[in-house]
Amino acid sequence: GDLPIYVAEDSVDVWSCPQEFQLDENLLPTEVAGCPPDGFSATGQLWGNPLFDWDAMAANGYAWWVRRIRHLCGIYDVLRIDHFRGFAGYYAIPYGDKTAENGRWRTGPGYALFAAVKKELGSPRIIAEDLGFLTDDVRALLKECAYPGMKVLEFAFDSRDGGDYRPH
């Protein structure tokens, strides 16, 4: 099954657990998810999803994530977590901006989240989507979690990504 890292602003998750997200007093996001400007998009990608309040989640042992992964493991044999890099570091854009140009990188929960998952659920079968902009902290998190990543053979022949995707 596919597990997107983020949920929609109008999702049941945000409605029922607002304390788990970066929301203001009117329950609107303070910042939203996206990607910075790059060679593919001069203004970046503005996804618009509310961001998690990682401090609040850490304080309750990442219970929201544990419940989410537990439920999906009951449905699927293997989970592919989309945008895995967001657990190491994520791009936060001020809510209301029209582009991603004013965003900033923030530190994600890192291994602490996955340690909580492993403590509660053992070792669920997870594949980490690790395509795109990867940094050393993302590679270190992948290694610490011991989750397999993804390789797209077509990317091996695209000079923008170098040789990371070559099969040998």
Question: Predicted segment positions?
Answer:
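Conserved hydrophobic/aromatic pocket- or pore-lining residues that grip, position, or stack substrates
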Residues: D2
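Alpha-amylase-like alpha-glycosidases and glucanotransferases acting on alpha-linked glucans and related
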Residues: Y6-H168
